[in-house]
Amino acid sequence: MARKLEIVGAVMVVCALGFGLGAASATSGIASPITLTVFEHSTTDKVIDVGTHGDSTGDILTFHNKLFDETDTTKVGTLQGQCVRESPRAGTWECWWTMSLADGQVTVEGPFSDTSDTDFAVTGGTGIYENVRGSMQVEAINGGAEYKQTFSLIP
C-alpha cells in the first residue's frame, strides 16, 4: 500500500510540474502592462479594385509600411497587412496586420473606419510580445498619410 501511495505521489508531482511548466511557457515576455506608440508612414498602400468598378464591397487594401517611434523620427520596424472593404457607404474595412519590431511582432484585427479613430483587438505576438493581449487605437494624421498607433498590451 505504501508503494502504491509513493507511485501516486510521484505521478502527481510529475503532473504538477508539467502543468507548471506549461503555465510558465504561456506567459508573456513583458512583465506588466505597457503602452507602446508608433507612427506608420503610409507610403505603400494599394487598393485592388474587385468586382464593381470604384470603391465597392470586396475591394482589397494591402500595405507594407515603415514604423517610427513615438517622436515620429526614428524607424523602429515595419507594418504589413491587408483590409477588405466591408461598406463603402459607412467607410469601413475589416483589417488584420502585423507590426514587426526588433524584439518581436504584434498582430491586430478588427474593423477600420475611414472617418474616425478606430480600436483594434490585439490577437497575439512573438518574441517579447509572446501571448500578449490588449487593444490598439489608430488615429489618422495628415489625412491618412500617417497613422498614430497606440498599443495597450497586457501580459
Q: What are the functions of these language-model segments?
A:
Residues 9-20:
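Bacterial N-terminal signal peptides
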Residues 19-29:
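Bacterial Sec-dependent signal peptides at the C-terminal "C-region" and cleavage site
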